[in-house]
Curated annotation (Swiss-Prot):
Source organism, top-level taxon: Bacteria
Recorded GO MF terms: L-malate dehydrogenase (NAD+) activity
Protein name: Malate dehydrogenase
UniProt-listed SUPFAM superfamilies: LDH C-terminal domain-like, NAD(P)-binding Rossmann-fold domains
Gene3D superfamilies: Lactate dehydrogenase/glycoside hydrolase, family 4, C-terminal, NAD(P)-binding Rossmann-like Domain
Species this protein is from: Aliivibrio fischeri (strain ATCC 700601 / ES114) (Vibrio fischeri)
Amino acid sequence: MKVAVIGAAGGIGQALALLLKNRLPAGSDLALYDIAPVTPGVAADLSHIPTPVSIKGYCGEDPTPALEGADVVLISAGVARKPGMDRSDLFNINAGIVKSLTEKIAVTCPKACIGIITNPVNTTVAIAAEVLKKAGVYDKNKLFGVTTLDVIRSETFVAELKDKDPGEIRVPVIGGHSGVTILPLLSQVQGVEFTAEEVAALTPRIQNAGTEVVEAKAGGGSATLSMGQAACRFGLSLVKALSGEEGVVECAYVEGNGEHARFFAQPILLGKNGVEEIQSYGELSAFEQEALESMLDTLRGDIKIGEEFVQ
């Protein structure tokens, strides 16, 4: 199994590469690519970690050597948020980066599963889909917006609030991956009850957790380490499912039946071909139903921007 990390010299990419080097199954190949010349050095550094995962780094304008033969491609390339920016402020730079990288994927490894980490995910996934469609290689079961960070934040904050082991908490998060489009389904957390006040406080905290980190880093970056962990969790789940393990479920932002929007995050059963089944997210509370309905215009607007960028 070959996994390619694109944008591997950045804060997320390096954290993700470190985790994958330690946690990918024995015999896996890990390819690191970034435009930055430091990338082969990042791979050399990680190659000294004694795990049965081979690693190679590539830099320069062309990601093709890193992409050749890849089963999974995780894209974290782009610029990070700074204080005062929201994820959509990143669009002007990151849209072009995702477009050109996806064009290379369409030619080099069109059958790979692609996980998009680069923000704004609500929009960059739509860009990737349109690029792949134009190239005649789009498979909606193999393109994912990685929203796992919203899930792990939800699990962490719920565990803290309720004094539970975070490893035992499961919180489905639906919708999109920015602001009001992030909807944690707190009503579905098993073995935990929330007051209306707790839900009203916890929901926006999860939605704005990225801003919390950006401000805490005081201009020194955004959420890179927790995002690296989230992307590793999703990447490893993909690898397990592609290898034939059954019952692997993660929330991700994918093209489904279009009930709410063309792309929508919800629980996904992963399989040998990517999305095996888009699972029902069950019944919503009145609070969640209202939040869902009020976010849809924002989400659909984000998607439209991505679609129009490629036209």
